Amino acid sequence: MSRLFMILLVICVITLGTDASQAEDSGTEKRSWPVPDAFLKAFQSWPLTDPDLKAGFKVNSAQRVAHGYGK
């Protein structure tokens, strides 16, 4: 669930960023929200690269397959 939420959040941030760059290019007023630096730092350090978290996902996946939930 949290992975889906983060993917949707990335899509929204990318969409807002492209809207802002198009507005700057066309000379119209920029209407997107600025993304705070703290949010960007938190997002860049998102724990998908953390080996402990990856190991946790693998264990969870193995348990789901063993119990028949992953079919």
Swiss-Prot record:
Q: Where in the cell is it found?
A: Secreted
* MF terms (GO), sorted A to Z: ion channel regulator activity; toxin activity
Q: Which residues form the propeptide?
A: 21-31
Q: At what positions is Tyrosine amide found? A: 69
Q: May I have one GO cellular component term?
A: extracellular region
Does this entry carry the keyword Mitochondrion?
no
Does the UniProt entry include the keyword Lipoprotein? no
Q: What is its main location?
A: secreted
**Entry keyword set:** Amidation, Cleavage on pair of basic residues, Ion channel impairing toxin, Neurotoxin, Secreted, Signal, Toxin
Q: In which tissues is it expressed?
A: Expressed by the venom duct.
Which residues belong to the signal peptide in this entry? Answer: 1-20
Q: Describe the family membership recorded for this protein in Swiss-Prot or TrEMBL.
A: Belongs to the conotoxin NSf-1 superfamily.
What does this protein do, in the record's words? Answer: Probable neurotoxin with unknown target. Possibly targets ion channels.
Its UniProt miscellaneous note says: The mature peptide does not contain cysteine residue.
According to UniProt, the name of this protein is Conotoxin Pl071
**Taxonomic lineage of the native organism:** Eukaryota, Metazoa, Spiralia, Lophotrochozoa, Mollusca
